[in-house]
């Protein structure tokens, strides 16, 4: 057993002995990359399919922009909570999530997701939804345009064991991710 795992087991045991709350892994149903963050597709189709009760937007700019948060709150389904955290705050608090929180995590780009994963956020699967065309990007799927920086982040996510899929909405087929690396 690795020393890191041994340390974690010992730390958890000590916390339990002290009567401290030991948090489990957060229930992140899916992480999605979407330039638009929360909008109609995310709020209705994805959230409905996933059965989540919390949409967590991990984005440094939006975390401090009450106007954008308000607009996204209008798109969120009733009964579904929204949270807007910086990447660092997401890393710091995600393991404090209640077992009753079923989380749909939304980030703006693959670099942000990579930051979260490297920071210890247990993201197992990333849905690549909307990455709009911009200068220096190339279209690789219906709604996905990437540049070299995006491709490097996707490669590293794969190397870290994160599953990637390209799919706009839950009712459409998954597109071939090899397109990302061409």
Positions of predicted regions on the chain:
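Short basic, glycine-rich beta-strand/loop surfaces that mediate nucleic-acid
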Residues: 65, 71-75, 79-83, 93-106, ...
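Ordered, amphipathic secondary-structure segments that act as subunit-interaction surfaces
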Residues: 84-129
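Structural motif
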Residues: 27-31, 53-56, 81-83, 102-105, ...
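Glycine-rich, aromatic-bearing surface loops/beta-hairpins
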Residues: 119, 124-182
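Short, Lys/Arg-enriched N-terminal segments with co-localized hydrophobic residues
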Residues: 3-22
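A general structural motif
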Residues: 34-39, 86, 146-147
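Long, hydrophobic N-terminal alpha-helical segment
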Residues: 19-20, 24-76, 81
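Short, ordered loop/turn segments at secondary-structure junctions
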Residues: 59-62, 87-90, 110, 129-133, ...
